[in-house]
Amino acid sequence: MRRWLITLLFMLCCGVSFAQQHDQQQLQKLTQFYNYLRSNYVDEVDLEPLVEEAIKATLSELDPHSSYITAEDLQRMRASFSGEFTGIGISFISLRDTIIVNRVLEGSPAAKAGVKKNDRIIAVDSTSLVGVSTSEAQGKLRGEKGTISTLSIVRGKCDNPLYINIKRDDIPTKSVSLAFRLDNNVGYVRIDSFLSRTLAEEFTQQVNTLGSIDALIIDLRNNSGGLLSSAIRLSELFLNRGDLIVSTDGRKENSTYFASKNGAFRKLPLVILTNEETASASEIFAGAMQDHDRAVIIGHRSFGKGLIQRLVNLPDGSGIKLTIARYLTPSGRVIQRPYQNGDRESYVRDRERYNHLDSVQLAELPTYTSLRNGRTIYGGGGIHPDVYVTLTGESLPFVSALRQSKSISEIIVSIFDSVDIDSFLDRYPTLEAYTNDFTLDREAIDLMISRVHSFNPDLTDDPEGLNKAQDIIKAQIAEEVYGVGTYYLIFGHREDQMLKSAHDIASNPASIRTLLGYSD
């Protein structure tokens, strides 16, 4: 017996040694190839792009999330994780070869310099932006902190440009983009990302501004994630001290993360919205809430991005994100959905399959048990909602054509070419006055009809669709004039099928308890 064990150990050690020797030979082979190439190729060879492509090709054969990052992109990524960006503080769209400002961040250098929404930027430092792509324009507008650029701007119907000097500076970012009250004492908060280290504090502040509420809807749709620490701290707000939030399973190290205190909102009824773009840190939060029977998840199956990447810095300032472990929800579910190494195209395409229950065969999925009430929850990658909402689509042909033609922004810009926001507020000083009294003028309606029929010449008359399209434009104008969130207040919660389902459930806390398996 002892001799057999010694023989087995010897064979295992030899196997490891042979494997290590083989790996070393492959590395030497690669080094020898590049040295020979550099010394003997007929022309002088720049190795930098070749090495970059080799790294990218290698990583592409692994999991879908290991990737190479250029030095420039790595610098921007670090800025995003610090919660601050350097720039002028605007976002913009390209409309008919023109760069048009669609958002000016409050307190940003652009806001202080007088840039306004719907301004057309025709040049930066005498370099024309007419006809350039949004990515090219973004490159021209970027710069180091403290540098100054002159924007040439056309405003409204005035042909003479304005020249505005802007000094680039740090721009604090917000993770919570919307927070408001719906009917029946239901609060609504939309979290766009988990990139900010102060997300939990920002979230708490926004919820407290809502006053006394009986239930809360957290919208995580299209939230691509961010920091693990932010997901943990947000989860703590809704859990009891000692509750498991997430664990990791890796080749070299495993970790577990628990709530360090009783959460301020641990007794607040909670509904969470997810879709196929809800990923990473947002899935950690949603998974913890579902596993502890703290929230009803509504919408679509989430993306299923549950791999942990470690950033490895390379000497030239670039880096690689290398997958080192997997995230597990408190019940032991793997968040990462299945993938085939090297097949990233199918991986990205498949996420769109999970937008309704019919495409998800629950009977084929591994089942788990929730931690408080023992109800059945499903694994197999991503967070499966407790209530699936199948989107029926916008059946009205005119509305569908309007959205597909991407003409809404053009119509909004044309309206504000004729009247500025201050004049608008003089006429409609409150949102209530605007909602009751404002109607689109004939010029805006004709432009909308023209754009829709240019997109689809065969479209027949659709009076109901035309009326709904006017409501959509009206709600978008409200967003421009009265601030972020007003679109949802006057129209969005009626149009948004997922939000409507969430509101119906949140309006009845007893239904939340029933769905979560509580017995009263």
Language-model regions: role of each:
Residues R103, V132, N165, T323, ...:
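Short linear motifs in exposed loops
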Residues V334-I335, Y339-D520:
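Conserved functional hotspot residues or short segments at active or partner-binding sites
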Residues M1-Q24:
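Bacterial Sec-dependent N-terminal signal peptides
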Residues A281, D293, G304-P366:
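Polar, glycine-rich mid-to-C-terminal structural blocks
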Residues Y41-N102, I148-L178, S230, G492-H503, ...:
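Extended, small/polar residue-biased N-terminal targeting/export presequences
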Residues A19-Q26, L30, Y34-V42, D46-L47, ...:
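Cleft-lining beta-strand/loop regions that shape enzyme active-site pockets
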Residues I122-A123, V296, K321, Q336, ...:
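Hydrophobic beta-strand signal
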